[in-house]
Amino acid sequence: MAASTSHLRSLCSSTRSLSRSGVIVTPIACRGYATTDPSPSATTPTPVRRRTTFKDKLNAGPSFSDFVSNGNDNAPLDPSEAYALKTALVGPAGRKKEMTRLPSWLKTPIPDSKNYQRLKKDLRGLNLHTVCEEARCPNISDCWGGSDKSSATATIMLMGDTCTRGCRFCSVKTSRAPPPLDPHEPENTAEAISRWGLGYVVLTSVDRDDLVDGGARHFAETVIKIKQKAPSILVECLTGDYAGDLDMVKLVARSGLDVYAHNVETVEALTPQVRDRRANFQQSLRVLDAAKKAQPTLITKTSLMLGLGETDEQLWDALRQLRAVNVDVVTFGQYMRPTKRHMAVHEYVTPDRFELWRQRALEMGFLYCASGPLVRSSYKAGEAFIENVLKKRRAASGGAETIGERPVAVDEASR
């Protein structure tokens, strides 16, 4: 420390002696960077890397798609190979479990189209819900992603997004005390549908056992509002069972809708394991029967899931009972487990078997049957056929409404 101090003093004394001798000492005021850009003349060209034998082999070798297809892109598959289910080990090391992969015929694209974004924006803006989103429907990219307004379809879910029942196959939220009904929902729903310019719309709802009428009047009011804004639109209503209150079923059936749908979901023997304890197969049959008797011109419709462990004889029995109450349309679709909390899939039914049951249903006298792994009760493939049938019926009757077809007010329909 003493040495550095003496050195500093000697520097200062030398500076003072220079100033006394007439020499002006100017401090250096320039700065420079640690590194500077080299001049163009100093820039050396980057040497070109020599092509290697390894790189040549890669360029001449198989592409990524060849690896994915395993080299069998054009090789025909027999049914046993095409429908073979693959497995994979899933989980942390030491605790891996063998899981069955989703079959290729059940895979769908991720929704991302202009129509999809438009429908979603309209629904959120009007505070409306859809069963497409709540039930995690695999067809949402297809139904919402049409190339124009007329081909896009959304199934609007009325009375909120919370159900009072807890079926073991359904992913809709449940609660014993869901939020109260939105009094503006009928008007908002009619506004959304008129904005989309659709020719066919599907309405459904959660079960509301907390309400005296199960929400039937709210449902009927929505149909009436839609018909007031767009008289030519065809309306399908997928309703609950209203706890077996057939007067409420008749109220909705007489509200002016065109298709009355109520799903039995599965065969009678499996109903206690699949559906909520407050629902049963015979009660669902009575709902469909009451709707047809209240409005004979209605098309009645129901849906069953396959892959829950049902037998052929149980399916035959279910179809016979449905035809006995004059159900017009039936659909078959693959049950797909929404979460680990729900029922496990017993079987992935092949497309060939779905086609077999479609033919059997038509032979039994059903007006129409949509059957396939991805078919759902409100899938748009069925709507196109039903729309044509309804238009032909209207044309045959001269387009005039009969007294039985006239939509009535909610209070009048409940009498």
Swiss-Prot record:
Residues 148-367 form the Radical SAM core domain. It is found in: Mitochondrion. Pathway: Protein modification; protein lipoylation via endogenous pathway; protein N(6)-(lipoyl)lysine from octanoyl-[acyl-carrier-protein]: step 2/2. Its cofactor is [4Fe-4S] cluster. [4Fe-4S] cluster 2 binds at residues 163, 167, 170. It comes from the Eukaryota. Pfam families: LIAS_N, Radical_SAM. [4Fe-4S] cluster 1 binds at residues 132, 137, 143, 378. Binds 2 [4Fe-4S] clusters per subunit. One cluster is coordinated with 3 cysteines and an exchangeable S-adenosyl-L-methionine. The keyword Transit peptide applies. InterPro entries: Aldolase_TIM (IPR013785), Elp3/MiaA/NifB-like_rSAM (IPR006638), LIAS_N (IPR031691), Lipoyl_synth (IPR003698), rSAM (IPR007197). One of its GO terms (molecular function) is lipoate synthase activity. It catalyses: [[Fe-S] cluster scaffold protein carrying a second [4Fe-4S](2+) cluster] + N(6)-octanoyl-L-lysyl-[protein] + 2 oxidized [2Fe-2S]-[ferredoxin] + 2 S-adenosyl-L-methionine + 4 H(+) = [[Fe-S] cluster scaffold protein] + N(6)-[(R)-dihydrolipoyl]-L-lysyl-[protein] + 4 Fe(3+) + 2 hydrogen sulfide + 2 5'-deoxyadenosine + 2 L-methionine + 2 reduced [2Fe-2S]-[ferredoxin]. Keywords: 4Fe-4S, Iron, Iron-sulfur, Metal-binding, Mitochondrion, S-adenosyl-L-methionine, Transferase, Transit peptide. Its main location: mitochondrion. One of its GO terms (cellular component) is mitochondrion. HAMAP family: Lipoyl_synth (MF_00206). PANTHER family: LIPOYL SYNTHASE, LIPOYL SYNTHASE, MITOCHONDRIAL. This is Lipoyl synthase, mitochondrial. The lineage of its organism: Eukaryota, Fungi, Dikarya, Ascomycota, Pezizomycotina.
